[in-house]
């Protein structure tokens, strides 16, 4: 991954410390499934047109990624807005923009580029702080999604806030950002459910390094104690069975943050 120019510019990445001011923006995670053979064309459209038009209409582009093992031809990206009203107004203006319509028409001369879109609205957790500009160097991002048992998201957030972030850093993982689903998911297209979902990003030197870090993390007596105490307080596991999903990502060449 190339050197980051400025994380403050794009406002995405987090540190383990709490933010001096809460980040009240609305975030959106969007996943596009490209038609067979069309992912390169989709990336070209974003590179040449879409990012500029998003900026024109007041949307903040954060990161654009593809999975390391991209068997589904996915593009995963994150945007930020002042609030939901700003988001809806920005998309309405973008979709009506003649420049967008022309770019879409030209790019789809040989067929549609996208077969399916998923979207979820996110809010920053209180332990996901904006960080100073920094370079991550070579490596991979990891997108992790946790689904909790009903009523246990607060317990999960508390465990991350008080223990997990520090232990991740101890074992060589870099905390990037942490989100919960926004309460208002109207218009979203996602299987995720508000009130029981934590979504976050880490960086690692490699997928192998990630495995080694998590193996050491899970064996750490401090983690074992924190996990046991949090589950005792909640009355059971904080996440549902098979409720932790992980996907390694690499940034596209046009991603603002790399």
Indicate where each model-derived feature is located.
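Short S/T/G/P-rich N-terminal loop/turn motif that feeds into the first structured element of a domain
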Residues: 19-225, 229-258
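Bacterial N-terminal signal peptides
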Residues: 5-15
């Amino acid at each position: 991954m190339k050197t980051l120019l400025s994380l403050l510019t794009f406002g995405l990445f987090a540190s383990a410390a709490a933010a001096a001011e809460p980040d009240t923006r609305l975030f959106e995670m969007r996943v596009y499934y490209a038609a067979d053979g069309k992912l390169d064309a989709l990336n070209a459209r974003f590179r040449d047109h879409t990012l500029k038009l998003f900026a024109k209409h007041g949307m903040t582009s954060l990161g654009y990624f593809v999975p390391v093992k991209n068997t589904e031809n996915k593009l995963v990206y994150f945007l930020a807005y002042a609030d939901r009203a700003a988001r809806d107004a920005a998309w309405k203006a973008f979709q009506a923009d003649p420049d967008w319509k022309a770019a879409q028409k030209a790019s789809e001369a040989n067929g549609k580029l996208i077969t399916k879109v998923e979207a979820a609205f996110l809010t920053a957790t209180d332990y996901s702080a904006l960080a100073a500009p920094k370079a991550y160097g070579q490596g991979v991002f990891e997108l992790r999604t946790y689904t909790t048992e009903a009523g246990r998201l607060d317990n999960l957030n508390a465990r991350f806030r008080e223990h997990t972030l520090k232990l991740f850093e101890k074992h060589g993982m870099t905390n990037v950002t942490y989100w919960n689903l926004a309460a208002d998911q109207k218009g979203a297209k996602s299987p995720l459910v508000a009130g029981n979902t934590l979504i976050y990003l880490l960086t690692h030197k490699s997928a192998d390094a990630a495995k080694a870090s998590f193996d050491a993390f899970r064996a750490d007596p401090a983690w074992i104690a924190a996990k046991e105490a949090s589950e005792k307080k909640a009355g059971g596991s904080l996440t549902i069975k098979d409720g932790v999903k992980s996907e390694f990502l690499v940034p596209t060449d046009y991603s603002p943050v790399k």
